[in-house]
Each structure stands twice: as C-alpha cells, then as structure tokens.
C-alpha cells in the first residue's frame, strides 16, 4: 500500500477546508491563505522510515516516522501534537492528539488519485491529489 502512495502529488480539489480550519482554531487571515493553497505532497521511504513533505505558497511541512510509533509534530496550523501513523489494507491513517483534541488524517488511493480526508470532531475536509511524479522517491 505505501508503495502506491510514494511519489509526488499535486492538489486538484478541496472540499470543506474553511469549516475544517475554523474547527482547528485557525484564524481568519490564515484560513484565507489556506484556502488559496494548492499543496504538493511528496511521500518517500528510506528503509522503514516514511517521509511526507507538503509544500505550498502558504507553508511547508515535513514529517518522518515509523509506522505504529508515536512522534511529535508541529502541524501547518501551528499545533504541537503527538502523532502516530498506521497502515491498514486501504489507507495510511495518521492520528494527531493535542490539548484534548484529536485529528485523523486518512490517505488512500481512489481511481489512481490520492484522497486525503482530515477529520476533527465531526468536520471533514477532503483533498484530492493527482500524481505528477514517481521518480526518486524511495531510498531503500
């Protein structure tokens, strides 16, 4: 499953980002910039370490982790979280915990596109990406 997600992906659509960012407590000005962002995501592996790099005009973010192991992360929204990523048959599932809140980010392939569903409380933001490159993404 992780092999299929490796590569570089560009955002082609986003649904419900305003409500999602508001639920996260992100301010109005940052939400406005966030709505304009069309991020590019690169997923790569080096042995058992997975790296996800997200780049946009608004912010860049990079996380590296091993499946099932907790790690600290500072989100693009500025939250310091305890995060854990697991893999099931269909999805890469990331759970972020901070200040008594929990966010779940699910990455999966649907018809050759990467669909990322981010959920906080009952608010879901869905962003769809298309693959632009699968070159030079694995160092293992």
Swiss-Prot record:
Family in the record: Belongs to the calycin superfamily. Fatty-acid binding protein (FABP) family.
Gene3D superfamilies: 2.40.128.20
UniProtKB keywords: Lipid-binding, Transport
Lineage: Eukaryota, Metazoa, Chordata, Craniata, Vertebrata
A single GO cellular-component term on record: nucleus
InterPro entries assigned to the protein according to its UniProt record, in alphabetical order: Calycin, Fatty_acid-bd, ILBP, Lipocln_cytosolic_FA-bd_dom
Stretches that traverse the bilayer: none
Tissue distribution: Expressed in a number of retinoblastoma cell lines.
Residues that bind a fatty acid: 107, 127-129
GO biological process, one term: fatty acid transport
GO molecular function: fatty acid binding
Biological role stated in the UniProt entry: May play a role in lipid transport.
Protein's name according to its UniProt entry: Fatty acid-binding protein 12
């Amino acid at each position: 499953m992780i092999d299929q997600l490796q590569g570089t992906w560009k955002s082609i659509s986003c649904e419900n980002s305003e409500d999602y960012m508001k639920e996260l407590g992100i301010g109005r000005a940052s939400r406005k910039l966030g709505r304009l962002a069309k991020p590019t995501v690169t997923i790569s592996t080096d042995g058992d370490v997975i790296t996800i790099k997200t780049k946009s005009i608004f912010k860049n973010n990079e996380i590296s982790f091993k499946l099932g192991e907790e790690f600290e992360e500072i989100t693009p929204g500025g939250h310091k979280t305890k995060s854990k990523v697991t893999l099931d048959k269909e999805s890469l599932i990331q759970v972020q915990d901070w200040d008594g809140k929990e966010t779940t980010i699910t990455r999966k392939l649907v018809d050759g596109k990467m669909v990322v569903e981010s959920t906080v409380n009952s608010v879901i933001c869905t962003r769809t990406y298309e693959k632009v490159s699968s070159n030079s993404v694995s160092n293992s």
